[in-house]
Amino acid sequence: MQSNTDSSTSGTYSQTVGLLYVFNLIVGTGALALPKAFQTAGWLLSITLLTFSAFMSYVAATFVIEALSVANAVLSKKRRVEYDDVVVADGPSTFEISKKVEVSEMASMFLSKVSLVFSYFAIIIYLFGDLAIYSTTVPKSAMNIVCATINASTVKSSDPCHESWPEILTRMTVYRFFVIIFVVVVCLPMVIAGITKTRHIQIMTTLSRWAAFILMISLATMQLSSDGAAAHPPAYNFHGFGSLFGCAVYAFMCHHSIPSLITPMRTKDNVFGKIALVYGVVGVFYFTLSLTGAFAFEHVQDIYTLNFFHDGNTSFIYSIIDYFLALFPIITLTSSYPIIALTLINNFNVVKDILCPKVGQENESLLEADSLVEDNDTDDEREARNARNEKSVFDVLVPALVLALPTFLSLLTDDMLLLASITGSFPGVAVQFAIPCLLVTAARKHARSVLNFPVPRKNNSPFQSPIWIVLISSWAGFSMIMVLLNLVGVKF
């Protein structure tokens, strides 16, 4: 989990390519829930909330970059101490971002143990929600491909998958069957084998993502032009605030991966301004996707791609496009699931080491004792015994929990909008807002008191006033309260 990699040796790319990676990271499958949220909450409230949420997300992203520069200065000073390098003095150059320091490692550098554990737990719960969304979206898409196409608000999970099928095979039964198939047959072997995304899969998913979103915007626009608006969402509906806010946070989530994308950039000139431009482009993209969908379809599905699979166009070309859009979440999320699962396992192991450090030390002592007692064993016997000793309860329990809990949530509900709103509203708020605020506050203090040098203007977030941290914290707190009130059924 903790790895600082020199960008000069791990591969670099131009700033333009890096910004494109940031764009691709932000525009993920969370965008598929936005059109439904727009239609539920109203177009004016949605535009206002999404704009404000995007701005707050951008402020938090600049905090992560500033903390990253301080982390690089800390590592630079550590290297000078280790190698007794007195030639290079402390200065602005030590804050240059040349080493990749993950958010988890920055938390270990700057935060207290309580804040560190909070950060890890927030990331863990967020990743749990992420996996639950994945293991809901893929099976629901597969179920809609297999079952009769219904594009209406009257469809129920208890409806039969096909009229000619046995009554027991309802849409929910088929969905749950696909949940088990997806997790046990497809994803579990990849997680056990430790398969991660290759370059070719990354290129394929990026191209399919761009093609899918462009097709959805184009088809919805064409439908509006030819048939007019099928729905007339209100300007605002505060009862839809909860789902909208959660989806807005989820749709702009990128902070946990910023170090991996920013560090390899060959030049980081005006990086804050250019990332602001990326956020602006993403915002326009989201508005176009969501507004066209909210008005073009009478009933927007919680997985937006399903609206096109269920439309009235039956020509050969449209059928190919519809099946591609229906398969799009299956392709992209299946390739990402093992990465999220392995990241979650790593975070669990780190928290275990933080909370129970003595367990590892005791195991080491036992291994040393065993080696003294059984020095006469053969190499094969010693190797087999060590492998058995190294396998603890956690090694079996953690992967089981990682897959079992999100799968259980997916078996309970197929409401992807609900899962996205809860994941974005609670753990998502911590990952996107709370952790960056904690990091930048501690990093600035560390730069002044330990490094004895302020963060250079080039690496400074444009939002230096403590008021911004208070504002983000207040916004996050207010929003979580609103979401909670909506979830318990309070009317506004």
UniProtKB/Swiss-Prot annotation:
Which residues bear sugar attachments?
151, 313
* Keyword entries, A-Z: Glycoprotein, Membrane, Transmembrane, Transmembrane helix
| Sequence ranges on the Cytoplasmic membrane side | 1-17, 66-113, 198-209, 259-274, 346-392, 437-466
What stretches pass through the bilayer? 18-38, 45-65, 114-134, 177-197, 210-230, 238-258, 275-295, 325-345, 393-413, 416-436, 467-487
Question: One GO term of the cellular component aspect?
Answer: membrane
Q: How does it sit in the membrane?
A: Multi-pass membrane protein
The name of this protein is Transmembrane protein 104 homolog
